[in-house]
Amino acid sequence: MKSPLYISSRAILFALCSGCLLLTSSLVFSQNEAPPYLDARYRHWADSVISTLSLDERIAQLIMIPAYSNKDQVHIDSISQLVKKHGVGGIIFFQGGPVRQATMTNQLQKISKVPLMISLDGEWGLKMRLDSTVRFPYQMALGAIEDENLLYEMGEEIAWQFRRTGVHVNFAPVVDINNNANNPVIGFRSFGEDKENVTRKSMAYMKGMQDHGVLASAKHFPGHGDTDVDSHYGLPVLHFSKKRLQEIELYPFRKLMEAGLGSVMVAHMNIPALDSTLNLASTLSHPIVTGLLKEEMGYEGLVFTDALNMQAVAKFYPPGVLDAKALLAGNDILLNTMDVPAAIREIKAALERHEITQEVIDEKVLKVLKAKAWMGLDHWKPIKTDNLIADLNRPKARYLSRKLTSASLTLLRNENDLLPVKGLENIKIATLSLGAADTTAFQKGLSRYGKMSHFFFPKEGGIQELQDLKQKLSDFQLVLVGIHGLGIRAGTNQFGITPEMNVLIRELTESHSLVVSVFGNVYSLAEIQGLDKVQGLIAAYQETPLTQDLVSQIIFGGIGAEGRLPVQVSSYFKKGNGLKTDGGFRMAYTDPEAIGIATDNLSGIDSLVHLAIREKAIPGAQVLVAKDGKVFYHKAFGHHTYDSLKAVDLEDLYDLASITKISTSLAAFMHLKGKGQFDEGETLGTYLSMARGTNKENLIYSDILTHQARLQSWIPFWKSTVRKSGKFKWYTMKSDSSRRFPIRVAQDLFIHRKYDQKIYKEILESPLNPEPGYVYSDLSFILAPKVVEEITGVPFFRYLDKNIYTPIGANNLTFNPYQHYPMSEIVPSELDELFRKQLLQGTVHDEGAAMLGGISGHAGLFGTANDLAKLMHLYLYDGLYAGQQLIAAGVISTYSKCQFCDKGNYRGMGFDRPNKPGDPNGNAAASAPETSFGHSGFTGTYTWIDPVNGLVYVFLSNRVYPTRENRKLYQLNIRTEVLEQVYQALNHPLRIKDK
């Protein structure tokens, strides 16, 4: 799933050397690369601006004030006043939205004498502060990733988003080494506890941003990772020697500075080894900011204070005095100044007292102005708010978030190679969400892979609920547990793990195979009892719909596990732990970009389906497309009916119509072929005793399956049950079920128990077509269940379910879904006004199949696009799926070939194939290769397999609603045109720089 990256020439060198970055950094960057804005070319504009500024205005350039785009006009006016009257140098934005912030930024920039430096805390991207944006993983999750190139790519994308939103500084990365599991403020915000790993990740993130025009800011100097006090609320004290600080905490700062780090944020901590002044925060310490950072470490870039409204400093000094002390300590930019006039006044007073010189102030101002020039503020342009949210949510960003998240997920236990889960036919699976009261995204993701029952245990669950749950789970062998709603910070009551949860996990490990997925702070693993005995354990680091989706895919083998623990959680779960698994075991679910297609290049699919709905060709549809086992397009459109009362869901079942032929009859025949129990060279009479002595006895199956056995196309069996008056003949149908009329044809309609024999007799006694040649026929497929049952002694559907559907997890492929599913989950077909006189929902549309009780080999199967795609992947991979060769190798590839092309019959055995080249009424997409195959269905369904390109395509609709006379779907050629859109997208792959 890894895609090539677009990176600059400098970044290419970075990528090549990332593995040896810290040992041979001179191969990647010069040992003393200066911050980018210190280049001489930015001096001219800075000099021209500073010459126009008064002393007050120069001091104000060193002040950055907080602003919120989600507050009222009073707040906006107050910020505007500070910009216009006092000329503050910058804004740090907090909570809000992209458009509101961009609009506010434009307003403020227009009234500012000097363009404003705009900043934001975006450790995991804009989402840290702004709604309606893409969320990237927490840094702790990123620390689990082995490929630093992904972090460079993230830095590049975040830089693009920041610049698109008019933001110039990202207060990231956090380079604190989190070697204290109880740290209440850093924790999940750190890349981990290993200084080399933290440095590699920070370097990649920093370079990705700065190579693309956004200033990085390493924080929190000199290292906030081993504290147990949150500096937002108090002053942490760091009791370490300077030697220890040099070896550990300062290490990543030093390495990033050597590589051109743009800025540093100084933390609020008391560090006696560096400055013994009582209750003095490092932010206010001249020995730390000037002595250590600037002089000893030689740092020349911008130095930001941490927010000056934090209690670690604010409770000791009033506004103004605090700002002056921070500037005197050596900081360049005062962040979150709470009283701008007081700050300017106190700094001027310090100047008058000769505690600071004009030269030092001017030096700081020039540095700020040069940085602004590097940021492009020397030619500022308003932010365009049109399409801003769409731009920030571009597919490239979403796919990058997926790649990062996937690479971070860490498999910590996999006893007996349990994962990916194998042999679905042999186990009964339950899912259990702890800390949740409703179906989670994790459970929904798991459900894509097979049949399972969902259970919940909320945080408030007690002993009685626990015992009840254990009883319900007693029938299951495998329980897939997700732990949800965890606290993200240390010290939050065991992260939300309750005693009852621990009891439940401990006791379940004694009676079940257990796979536990922890969606939260990785340190919470230490609070969960019994994890050393579970069969599978996955650390997900955070709880988002995406993490839950991807973890479900690891469990069933859609994707592999790659991550490694970036911290030591306990003596059992150590830093560096992480087991690998391979993906591709079952279908994966991903974005088009994963297979080299731009999402936007598939917009034609949406347009075609919407056209079909608008033209009333169909009320709705499910569409799925996969390449090489990766489902990259899976959408539901429209509604069950034109009244728009029920929207189509991806879990809804459609009547598959004639796709039943290749999904049931052909599946069984090919399975039996592999076992040596069926051969297409034999005759119908060989396998079906009732055919012997009839004109069908000697029909050869290779002719039958290619529709050239001279069988009639179809027989309207239902007409034999109806009188001229329109009423049913008394011996055929009844409105109530009984011993004689037990077979349900539709709601309140039951057929005689022996009527199937009449149907079979009518088929066997029907005349053969007088001339040889291709005539598409249902008749042999109606007989197919009897053939399979006679060969195997097993009922038709039971045979399919046991040998095909359950092993591949296609449990939604079923006959008579009304027996198993709510009607709201079954899409209706036709409003039948001739035969059944009702809306058909949950019973098969085809009359003949309905008269056989809904189970037939030519029609009757229902399913979702997802489950049908599993079967089509089995066919794509020549009978191999989820590690099992369910159909003998070579059988499907043989059956799907053109059997009688020399006779003008282009069909495979059972499968449809592209018509003769040049046929204007083709049954396949124009670009589909000759070797592709599939089938269509009368109700508006279609599926196609392309072995050359590794494609599986499924289109499900109910075009027969409300009447089968609606032929617009055919006339518009929607089904094959949708597939053609895929081919066109494949022919226009992503450029490397677009990935």
Residue ranges of predicted features:
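Preference for extracellular/luminal or secreted protein segments
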Residues: 30-65, 69-82, 295, 317-594, ...
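Second-shell residues forming the walls of enzyme active-site clefts
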Residues: 54, 91, 100-116, 126-128, ...
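Bacterial Sec-dependent N-terminal signal peptides
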Residues: 1-33
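Short active-site loop at a secondary-structure junction
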Residues: 615-622, 643-704, 767-780, 856-859
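Short, conserved catalytic-motif segment at the N-terminal edge
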Residues: 594-656, 677-679, 686, 839, ...
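Short, surface-exposed loop or secondary-structure junction motifs
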Residues: 696-930
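Short, gly/Ser/Thr-rich active-site loops of penicillin-recognizing serine hydrolases
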Residues: 361-366, 370-378, 455-461, 568-574, ...
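A short, well-structured edge-of-sheet supersecondary motif
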Residues: 89, 262, 368, 613-647, ...
